[in-house]
Design a protein with these regions (language model features):
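Mature extracytoplasmic or organellar-lumen-exposed domains after removal of signal/transit peptides
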Residues: 1-252
């Protein structure tokens, strides 16, 4: 949200005390900026004492967002796991499904998911908040900076990608089957390195991005993330005869 549109909408909502934002059915029709996890974080971590006030508008609004997010999470899980859900379409891709023409298209989509998620972590969650210099660093550009979860979010993202890459029958196993073990080993080593280095930081990312002494470590982390993304996109994908598809982070 480079232009702060979401925060302006939230400020207006607080000013107007819009009751339609406190009911799940009407909240679901509103702008994403008024009902996403960023909005919930703002409600909880900006003036948290207000949440304790009886009949607090902020509390009712936060509860409505939480309920809506729970409903959306349940829908997402069901869409993935039901008998004819997305997981089943992926597993049966070799026989052609509505989602995938064949197993190669399915595998290509998952390479793309790995690459695009790594790019989001590198560019949006770290590089952009850091700026080109310490003086240009912007803490407010960090994901969940109010709750100081920025580092933990990146760790969880990377652990998920690592598990996805190394799962039995996944990309790591496939690389070994085509005699490309060195690339599998290199990717696993980079995953381990970036996760370890993130977890080793003693200060929150909200402090580190503006800390001159931490700059070199953060830049090394960026380089390792870039190396991992490049390895998967330009080497591993070719090893497996795959071509990453459309990347939503590319803009146009």
């Amino acid at each position: 949200d480079k232009r702060g549109t979401g925060q302006r909408q939230l400020r207006q909502a607080f000013k107007d005390k819009d009751v339609t934002l406190t009911e799940g059915t009407t909240l679901a029709t509103k702008s994403v900026a008024l009902r996403d996890l960023q909005a919930l974080e703002t409600l909880i971590f900006v003036k948290p004492e207000v949440l304790l006030e009886p009949g607090s508008y902020r509390c009712a609004y936060a509860s409505a967002i939480a309920d809506l997010q729970r409903t959306q999470a349940a829908l997402l899980y069901d869409t993935w796991s039901r008998p004819n859900g997305f997981a089943a379409e992926l597993i049966n891709a070799a026989s052609s499904t509505p989602a995938f023409f064949d197993e190669r298209e399915a595998a290509g989509a998952y390479v793309n998911a790995l690459v695009s998620t790594l790019e989001v972590i590198r560019l949006q969650k770290l590089d952009r908040p850091m700026g080109l210099t310490v003086s240009e660093a912007r803490t407010s550009r960090l994901e969940n900076w109010r709750s100081k979860r920025s580092t933990q979010n990146m760790v969880l993202n990377l652990l998920t990608l690592q598990r996805f890459f190394a799962v039995e029958g996944g990309f790591s196993d496939l690389l070994r089957r085509v005699d490309k073990q060195e690339d599998a080993t290199a990717a696993e080593a980079l995953f381990n390195k970036v996760i370890y280095n993130l977890q080793a930081f003693e200060s929150p990312m909200e402090t580190l991005v503006a800390d001159t002494k931490a700059r070199s470590n953060l830049e090394s982390l960026l380089n390792d993330l870039r190396a991992l993304q490049t390895l998967i996109q330009e080497k591993i994908a070719i090893d497996l005869g795959l071509v990453p598809g459309f990347n939503a982070t590319d803009g146009d």
